[in-house]
Amino acid sequence: MGKLKIVSKLSNIHSGEILEEEFLKPMSFTAYRLSQAIGIPQTKTSQILKGKRRITADTALMLSKFFGTSTKFWLGLQNEFDIEAECNNIKKKLELIQTWN
């Protein structure tokens, strides 16, 4: 029999980290350059990249237009992050809730 492989859970990844690592870095784009291209303040872009600000619907629309992705892609990344973070915040409370049958 094979050995059991223990897989550790990945940390909750903010949408800003994905924006930076998967889109900006490969394009050699800075927060400033992206901000200029999509018409939002550079401080807003920097806060998103640092995980201090959410990607909102308006920003998702601009990012999707610029990168040729869907708005749902960006909002989905943000929602997954938010749900996992909140699940961790209220984990004990959730454990007390009985599933209704």
Segments (PLM) and residue ranges:
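The DNA-recognition helices of helix-turn-helix-type DNA-binding domains
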Residues: 41, 52, 67, 78-81
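A short, Lys/Arg-rich alpha-helix, primarily the initiator
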Residues: 5-28, 76
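Short alpha-helical DNA-recognition segment
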Residues: 28-47
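The alpha-helix within a helix-turn-helix
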Residues: 24, 35, 64
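Intrinsically disordered, low-complexity and often Lys/Arg-enriched segments
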Residues: 1-7, 101
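Short, charged recognition helix plus adjacent turn
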Residues: 75-101
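Short, basic-rich loop-to-helix N-cap that marks the start of a DNA-contacting helix
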Residues: 52-65
